[in-house]
Amino acid sequence: MRTFRGLAAAFLLAVAPGAWAQLDNAATPVPLPIPIAAASTAMPAQDLDALRAVHAREINDLSTFRTAGLPREAIDSYLDSGPGQQFLRELRAADPAASADTIYARAVEQLASGSTLPALQPMAAALVKIVPHGQNVSPYSPYFTTSAQLQLASGRCATLADCFGLPLKSEAPLYDVYQIMPKGTVNVFVSQVAPTEELGGLVRRKGGAQQYLLPNRSLWSAPVLIGTIKN
């Protein structure tokens, strides 16, 4: 069963009612948007544990992780478009000292994580990200989603890892949910998470969740922990 435990009352007002969560030191439960969903029907935990034991090095260095996302030709065509040029401008603004080759490589990596061309949208609302319980959000990670999309994924996928195409290194029984806020109205690039595979196909994820690419994280607030959710 998945639950979402809230940690900061200030953020509860930003999300719609759903499953039950409880503030630390609070006496009564508070509704949050992550619903209760069925237990995972994906690969049994003992099988995943065995894979982790045998392939610890490959899992840790992500050397076998592959994304079946956009091909290079589609990415190059997108980068020549208006939205693609905006994507590149925001990458350059995030790291003005980076070379053109570095900016291009980052663009390819981020865009290839999706199976669809990103739609450029203005955004003035919060976004969220899940990380294994106890870990922090990288200050450079561009991959986020909305609380509504997290709710949708938790209801229709065997695991959140499956819907979001996570590598084994990033999969956990329990995730911390972090929220960021835009500093005004900013651009986001919305695409569908591509299928992924790892360890030569021993582990496959179907993807399909909606992701929000943020090529310039300096336009957003620092992440704030707002709760937890089960895989």
Indicate residue ranges for each PLM-predicted region.
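Bacterial N-terminal signal peptides that target proteins for export
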Residues: 1-8
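Long, low-complexity, intrinsically disordered regions
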Residues: 21-134, 141
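Catalytic toxin/effector domains delivered as secreted proteins or via bacterial secretion systems
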Residues: 90-231
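Short, solvent-exposed coil/turn linker segments
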Residues: 3, 44-47, 58-61, 146, ...
